[in-house]
Swiss-Prot record:
Species this protein is from: Arabidopsis thaliana (Mouse-ear cress)
Keyword tags: Cytoplasm, Iron, Metal-binding, Nucleus, Oxidoreductase
Catalytically driven reaction(s): L-cysteine + O2 = 3-sulfino-L-alanine + H(+)
E.C. numbers: 1.13.11.20
Induction: Up-regulated by hypoxia. Up-regulated by the ERF-VII transcription factor RAP2-12 during hypoxia.
The record's free-text note on cofactor binding: Binds 1 Fe(2+) cation per subunit.
Binding site for Fe cation: H148, H150, H211
Protein name, UniProt field: Plant cysteine oxidase 1
pH dependence: Optimum pH is 8.5 with CGGAIISDFIPPPR peptide as substrate.
Length: 293
């Protein structure tokens, strides 16, 4: 943590005005010398603790996203170097970098009668363009973002604080579909994560493209999507129901024969109901550091 200090111009003006004092030259000169030395030392320590280039963490994230996704598009995965570049930025992100604390109203659990229902999840929109989007999901305890997909996207997720369970799947590409809305998927992640932890990455066809978030404690997740959802371009957010392999399988199905093979697989069925019927996400104004000019 750095020391609070006035802007450099004010500090230098203050030093200059003090040096112009002429009364009691010996004592005043010594006193001013000590004060000036202390102020300049404080200023130097403040500069050391600040970003070397004077750019905030969220601005650095924005600039990096512009570079990483500059030639992106549906199904286009950034190069490994660019993925690592963005991952390193996200790994260092902290709640205070985006103006969040766990005591904010977004993270309060339901109480009374409301405690029986899933608490609302707040989405803070930071930026969106054709190439990428940046946003934050704020989840109270027991908050759930249902199982959903990310068509043609590369997605970076950074848990800023709290504890969250993540379950994710990828499609089994060569397996026949159960019906027009039901496909076989293989489990990718089924684990609980606690901040601080590194960012996770999913890809168009790998890394757990369909995932569900469940808040164990109050938590916040910073999401970067490249490219973002876009209904006119066919990148819809689709929600799924999850069924054990035996639940929808028949005797004629020979997708997976042995019990060992069946472990870690499930049927994912596209939901027909309105997403608003099973999601409780509300938008709120982002009040953290500026993302762009």
């Amino acid at each position: 943590m750095g020391f609070e200090m006035k802007p450099e111009k004010e500090v230098l003006e203050l030093i200059s005005s003090k040096n112009q004092c002429k009364s009691n030259p010996n004592s005043v000169k010594k006193k001013n010398k000590n004060k000036n030395k202390k102020m300049m030392m404080t200023w130097r320590r403040k500069k050391i603790d600040s970003p070397a280039d004077g750019i905030t963490a969220v601005r650095r994230l924005f600039n990096t996203c512009k570079e990483v996704f500059s030639n992106g598009g549906p199904g286009v995965i950034p190069s490994e170097d660019k993925i690592q570049q963005l991952r390193e930025i996200l790994d260092d992100m902290k709640p205070e970098d985006v103006g969040l604390t766990p005591t904010m109203p977004y993270f309060r659990p339901n109480s009374g009668v409301e405690a029986r229902s899933s608490p609302p999840i707040t989405y803070l929109h930071l930026h969106q363009c054709d190439q990428f989007s940046i946003g934050i999901f704020c989840l109270p305890p027991s908050g759930v973002i249902p199982l959903h997909n990310h068509p043609g996207m590369t997605v970076f997720s950074k848990l800023l604080f709290g504890t969250m369970h993540i379950k994710s799947y990828d499609w089994v590409v060569d397996a026949p579909m159960r019906d027009s809305k039901t496909r076989l998927a293989k489990l990718k992640v089924d684990s609980t994560f606690t901040a601080p932890c590194n960012a996770s990455i999913l890809y168009p066809e790998d890394g757990g493209n369909m995932h569900r978030f469940t808040a164990i404690t109050a938590c916040a997740v910073l999401d970067v999507l490249g490219p973002p959802y876009c209904n006119p371009e066919g990148r819809h957010c689709t929600y799924f129901l999850e069924f054990p392999l035996d639940k929808l399988s028949s005797e004629d199905d020979d997708v997976l024969s042995s019990e060992e093979e069946k472990e870690g697989y499930a049927w994912l069925q596209e939901r027909d109901d309105n997403p608003e019927d099973h999601t409780n996400v509300v938008g709120a104004l982002y009040r953290g550091p500026k993302v762009e000019d």
